[in-house]
């Protein structure tokens, strides 16, 4: 036997053995019999062509769960596929002059080879890529079923346009006013778009997310905030007589506009008496109509459009307004309020119009100060703030900022002295009595715009006919495949410039028609892939596997992929595609931390890769030049900062088990982990320690162990503790048990061979979730049957987990003076006698008068002295 473990030889050997044995293929429901099922899934990767250490950590965590479940007797489904559509492939095609499909499939092959080196327990029999026609053909069929159900519609809408990627972005894909992929400043354009009615499920999505007890609280909160349920008042402000002339000049349907007034939604009807102006969104229908023949308002709207589209950008932007000259009547006082167009009002929330109460909303306050509008306080604070000058005077002129806290109502006629909640209810009731409005529930969530003006995506399966309108592609004609002969020379969508593909006959009337040239947002592809892994078309098998029992992925997907997947599953349920009453796709969710690394800059200010620098104590230099290197922050590994570590190089140097061990051991899995060379070297040394321990075992399997030795107790406790730690996603705690266990085995070198063999056998069976290749080699070394990756988790002997003795502290007048170890079932009198005889306690009590001794069984001994 080799004196040193060689990971390169062992890992290649065992990966081949697993493949030959088809060890990780899930059993069919019929073959599984009474086995419980466990569907373990990590968010499938985009095939960029290279794995990074973040991938290694994510998939290693999923593998820990999958291997542990298999060892516990579960029928495990642990599949892998590829999220292959999207703009990066299309951009790569343009840059490299290759077809996006060729580029994607080449990358898939390269990454699949990398996955194999990691020793993951994946069921590759269910592999697919979302760019496979079979996959997106099924997606097209789902689209048509959603369409039949009324969950799909088309409308002209203001969209977020990415001028670099030449496509529409969903609100969630706009980050700080920029495209989430390109980083370009997003523009607003009006286009005809396809939408999914996700808002039909808003209430259900909100209510049910709080019931997902095995999801992180942070993710549940993020989804709840994104859905954004708010209760308030929707009411109509009627036009003042002074508005008649302006409306006659600028609006086409005067009667309609006059009768509707200005509809607003507010969550603060208690502040109605503090209203001093009305604000319309720049995209409000009335604003657009007024701007049609008003150059100044048109210019103002254009200026507003330059501000980013996100709420954060609008919040930070200087407040701007345009006085329309229109006025409305206050419903309670009859006074007139001016109507402005304001850049901080969002058309996508409520009605796109608000009443402004500057005294109690900071945006309104800033706007009122800028345009010299009244500020009327109507909420009186309590406590220290009650002595503010504006409270005493009741005048907004004395306010330095809006008061947004709680208090009681002032300056509000019939609501004075009421609490905010009581005032809200009474104000709503009064408005309803006047016939001007009613209590309403509103959602921040908007319908999902799914049209994208790109080639490399799932074609939308409809045909536009001049006579028949929108016609679904017949199911028999699916999939509508992407043409390969496309050109990326013209800007925009190549499908639009491909007449041979675009021009077709209408399937309804036979006349000339055109295909829809938009493709689906790629978040569609990942919104149902978990159901495809469960089964291609067998509803019973799909029902058996769903929901996913444990999903693993990044928290950055909280309000994108995870919300869309929850909607999709509900829609699939409602069209008969999944038998999942709850509509929840993921029973358990774990969001892992990132892998981070120091950043390095050369003397010339260029980013350097970790492999380009040398460290000698605190001194870091560039290997090529010998010049000092600036060591920067420890941040997420990034290609742009070059602080990445190539998993292939790590595996070639240390082996996959070392890489897995390190990314799982250094910190709790939900936290970020810093990759360090010294940490990897330490993990590699531990691999050799484990192997050396097995190397020292007898060559023949000894008799069964007996008795309650220290080593047996340590082994059975460690196996039980690791079992619990893995169940609770405390992988670093499970790994800590390994170190303790190995030390116990070293201390137990003098114990009988049977006890040492039992310890080694148990350790080998606990090792596969973390270091599967080493585990197989160790298992073979001690003559274990079959593959240890298929072996059962060791069952701990409960009698060995029970402590025979306990340690009790001894206090004298409330201060600890010693401790004593006694049998668990020792009588109180005997415990007292043993405690009194403890040398340190006995010495302390010498010459003192003992008043009382209190023994709390199993807990503590209290001695009271005079």
Task: Enumerate the predicted regions with their spans.
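Residue patterns forming the tRNA-binding/recognition surfaces of aminoacyl-tRNA synthetases
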Residues: 4, 13, 17-21, 95-262, ...
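Helix-rich, typically C-terminal accessory recognition domains appended to large enzymatic cores
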Residues: 83, 144, 148-161, 439-468, ...
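Basic, alpha-helical terminal appendages of large translation-related enzymes
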Residues: 1-35, 269, 281-284, 294-295, ...
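Amphipathic alpha-helical
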Residues: 10, 15, 199-229, 281-322, ...
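Long, charged, mostly alpha-helical binding arms that flank functional sites
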Residues: 2-5, 230-234, 380-383, 391-393, ...
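N-terminal catalytic cores of NTP/NDP-binding nucleotidyl/phosphoryl-transfer enzymes
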Residues: 29-98, 127-142, 266-267, 331-367, ...
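Conserved oxyanion/phosphate-binding beta-strand-loop segments in alpha/beta enzyme cores
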Residues: 1-41, 70-79, 101-113, 214, ...
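Catalytic alpha/beta core of large soluble enzyme barrels
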Residues: 62, 75, 284-382, 402
